[in-house]
Regions:
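Structural motif
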Residues: 44-47, 80-86, 133-138, 166-171
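A contiguous pocket-lining binding segment that forms or flanks enzyme active sites
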Residues: 114-146
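Short amphipathic alpha-helical segments and their helix-coil junctions
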Residues: 65-80, 122-127, 156-165
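Acidic/histidine-rich alpha-helical segments that form the ligand environment
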Residues: 135-176
Length: 177
């Protein structure tokens, strides 16, 4: 049971309704126009037309929620060439580390539906194990995300250099975010 259950749009205050619309627009831009992808990414329950996932939390303070959403969405907009499979690899490392069932489920569905990662790779990543059959970019993304979460502190120089080679400076900074 969520501490902040999803509400339908008509149950929200005007500022929350604006954020609701902005959230849905951001999800559509991020995952495309396929309604299945939008439902997956926003965890929208079409039977009650309420958005779950992070939205109830973001909507408590709509102006701060918008800033948080815009920062996350902005990374995708300024890094359009960041490899999607590496992005989903890093996302799964993070969501599983923080035990965010919603986000892990959403990123699993995105990675699976676009054939970015295999089921075995997803299972390993979400179990804090680096799959042996990842491509080079996914290995670098996994190693960087894993280091930042489990070891903490600055990336070691060799890992930083691997990130720069794989993703460039902007991509590396985006990955660290």
């Amino acid at each position: 049971m969520s501490r902040l259950p999803p509400q339908t749009r008509d149950q929200l205050q005007p500022a929350q309704q604006d954020l609701h619309d902005h959230f849905n627009d951001a999800v559509r831009r991020a995952v495309g126009k396929d309604p299945g992808n939008v439902d997956t990414a926003s965890h929208q329950d079409s039977s009650q037309a309420a958005i779950g996932g992070p939205f109830p939390f973001l909507s408590v303070l709509p102006s701060i929620g918008r800033l948080s959403l815009d920062m996350i969405a902005g990374l995708g907009q300024v890094l359009p060439d960041f490899p999607p499979d590496a992005r989903e690899t890093a996302s799964l490392v993070c969501t599983s580390y923080y035990k965010s069932d919603y986000a892990t489920s959403a990123h699993t569905k995105i990675a699976r539906s676009a054939a970015m990662l295999t089921d075995a790779q997803i299972e390993a990543i979400t179990s804090a194990t680096r799959p042996t059959d990842l491509n080079h970019r996914c290995i670098v993304a996994y190693d960087a995300a894993f280091h930042l979460l489990h070891v903490r502190g600055a990336l070691p120089q060799d890992l930083w250099d691997r990130c720069l080679l794989a993703f460039g400076k902007e991509g590396t900074v985006g990955l660290v975010h």
